[in-house]
Amino acid sequence: MSYLIIVRHGESGWNVDGRFGGWVDVPLTGKGIKEALLCAAELEGIDLDVTFTSKLIRAQETLFLILSKQKKIGVFVHEEAGTGEDRTEREDGSRKDRKEKRYAYPPNTEKNLIPIHSNEALNERYYGILQGKKKDKMKAKYGEEQILHWCRSFDEGPPEGESLKDIYRRAVPYFEKEIFPILQDGKNVIVCAHQNSLRALIKHIEGISNEDIRKIRLANARPVIYTFSGGRLVRENAETDPSVKRNL
């Protein structure tokens, strides 16, 4: 049996300021740091093997704080496109670049080193015309019902921005290709990311309908823990888990 832990980042400066953060790189607040450390304490009994996060600092900071409690040092894994000499040949004679995953230094040189995979597929929603704007001002301009629809529905997002369906299309293939095989190898994985990229993963893992996903909200820095056994992921304490709020 192995574990999959998904964690939304701790409170950020723009959570406090009431702004749509999206892809804007906003760090944690003092409260967010404390939340991440409390999350780490909840995970002390699970020895982490591999980590995944987005390209945004608030998710990365949350991950670093969790790893610090386990006395582990994260080593970023970088994907590099191959050079001309590194290309592989397809059956039809065409060529494609081979991507290699490289560490700044070997990850197995010390027992406390742990790989960190950082990818835009796990980024928060790109909010389009709402990006960086004050939530109360946008509700006054477009109406609270419209804002809720853009932010909660599966198929429709804010103008010039992403819907949850768009996020699902980038996050779920990444999960299936990069994360699921590691769970199959019996390793414990943590994913530190964002409200909407994690909602997309929860929808996929738990088979939640397009309508019911509207009701799912994630608390800051509260772990959602799945056990993986027999090819299936099952959430622990699914009915009482305070990390996942089933309301608007």
Curated annotation (Swiss-Prot):
Classification via InterPro entries: His_Pase_superF_clade-1 (IPR013078), His_PPase_superfam (IPR029033), PG/BPGM_mutase_AS (IPR001345), Phosphogly_mut1 (IPR005952)
Pathway per the UniProt entry: Carbohydrate degradation; glycolysis; pyruvate from D-glyceraldehyde 3-phosphate: step 3/5
Top-level taxon in the UniProt lineage: Archaea
Active site: H9 (tele-phosphohistidine intermediate), E124 (proton donor/acceptor)
Keywords of this entry: Gluconeogenesis, Glycolysis, Isomerase
GO MF: phosphoglycerate mutase activity
PANTHER family noted in UniProt: PHOSPHOGLYCERATE MUTASE
Coiled-coil regions, chain positions: none
Any single Pfam family the record assigns to this protein: His_Phos_1
Annotated stretches, region: Disordered: 82-101
Sequence intervals crossing the membrane: none
Site entry: Transition state stabilizer: H194
Entry protein name: 2,3-bisphosphoglycerate-dependent phosphoglycerate mutase
Binding residues annotated for substrate, in chain numbering: R8, H9, G10, E11, S12, G13, W14, N15, R58, E124, R125, Y126, Y127, K135
Job description of the protein: Catalyzes the interconversion of 2-phosphoglycerate and 3-phosphoglycerate.
Example of a GO biological process term: glycolytic process
Family classification: Belongs to the phosphoglycerate mutase family. BPG-dependent PGAM subfamily.
Reactions catalysed: (2R)-2-phosphoglycerate = (2R)-3-phosphoglycerate
EC number(s) given by UniProt: 5.4.2.11
